[in-house]
Regions:
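N-terminal accessory segment detector
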Residues: 2-122, 127-143, 153-200
Length: 200
């Protein structure tokens, strides 16, 4: 092979090697970039934008209704999982309260029971599972309402979930009251009602 040809091949190889090194270096820089993105953040962002779009297009009330359907189904699934894990066909009131706290803990919420009796369970929450994504997206609170309502009603017969305070609307903590009986007090508050087996 002529020397000129060898020189051309050598130059071409060095050029390709330089491109490869540059591409590898660029890829490393991109992979190590401090971009606040992972699967959890992506999914929470997706839910936030979906909720926001629904609120803008159909209004807050209807958006909450659509999200309620999703929350109801998730609530049923979670209820079945806990019943199976605890090997019981039905949860007691105390178990319902602990299950609701535990399920929120598992998704990085920080709910705790303030008080409970035969009429209601009162919860507070210091951290929303959706994080900052829930800000100004009150329809996303329907996930909590429906999951809590579905589990409470399926095990105890009835529930009315009252969202007294929510982080979504600017409160420092959430306050959620799950009414377990239809009383004058529960009928006087704004909330969503849930009944055992109503959707089956």
């Amino acid at each position: 092979m002529p020397l000129g040809t060898l020189g051309a091949h050598g130059a071409r190889n060095r050029y390709l090697e330089a491109i490869l090194v540059t591409a590898t270096s660029t890829l490393r820089v991109i992979q190590e970039a401090q971009v606040p993105l992972d699967r959890d953040i992506f999914l929470r962002s997706l839910l936030r934008e979906l909720a926001g779009t629904l609120e803008d297009v159909v209004g807050l009330k209807d958006a909450a209704g659509y999200i309620s359907v999703v929350g109801q189904r998730i609530g049923d699934q979670i209820n079945n999982e806990y019943r199976s894990a605890l090997q019981t066909p039905v949860l007691s009131r105390e178990q319902v309260a602990e299950v609701l706290v535990d399920l929120k803990r598992r998704i990085q919420g920080d709910f705790y029971v303030v008080t409970q009796d035969e009429d209601k369970i009162v919860f507070r929450n210091r951290a929303c599972p959706f994080g900052g994504m829930v800000s100004n997206r009150p329809s996303m609170c329907m996930m909590t309402s429906n999951v809590f309502g579905a589990i409470a009603a399926e095990n105890l017969g009835y529930a009315k979930v009252e969202l007294q305070e929510t982080i979504a609307q600017g409160a420092a903590e959430c306050m959620v009251v799950v009414h377990l009986k239809q009383t004058p007090q529960s009928e006087a508050v704004t909330g969503r009602e849930y009944f055992q087996n109503w959707h089956k």
